[in-house]
Amino acid sequence: MREYTSKKELKEEIEKKYEKYDAEFETISESQKDEKVETVDRTPSENLSYQLGWVNLLLEWEAKEIAGYNVETPAPGYKWNNLGGLYQSFYKKYGIYSIKEQRAKLREAVNEVYKWISTLSDDELFQAGNRKWATTKAMWPVYKWIHINTVAPFTNFRGKIRKWKRLVPEEQRIKRRKI
């Protein structure tokens, strides 16, 4: 996993990966948001919903701990060794929105991550053990949790949506958009 030496470096990497990820949705029509393609595990809407789910959970964990609540990770009723149901809850919660709305919501959530990073001290961000919700057997510092819920999936899921787009040629996507 990538190491970061400053808040600025982390925020710049999130922004770079997010912008590339988000741009992939420019040529996907609303009529195709739920279109399944063989060999790609998520529809465009599910792809965005997954990102929205994890980024918002990350922000929720922090907000709850700061407010004095005991945080149950990954989410109440879900376990780390069985995340399929959690993913389905993301698809249900965010899949009701259009691609445009999902993209806007993700942009808002990513902006909240930037603001949050700015509020953290270097110790809170880069030293393990500063947040109960981040204190697992792995003893990761908060920045690693931010990385695995932003940079890593923006990178990996960009590849998945690119594959989806290769299997649904642009001419077909444009033609369907006009209909």
UniProtKB/Swiss-Prot annotation:
Keywords: Cytoplasm, Nucleus. One of its GO terms (biological process) is mitotic recombination. One of its GO terms (cellular component) is cytoplasm. InterPro entries: DinB/YfiT-like (IPR034660), DUF1706 (IPR012550). The keyword rRNA processing does not apply. It comes from the Eukaryota. It is found in: Cytoplasm; Nucleus. Its main location: cytoplasm. Present with 172 molecules/cell in log phase SD medium. This is Uncharacterized protein IRC4. The lineage of its organism: Eukaryota, Fungi, Dikarya, Ascomycota, Saccharomycotina.
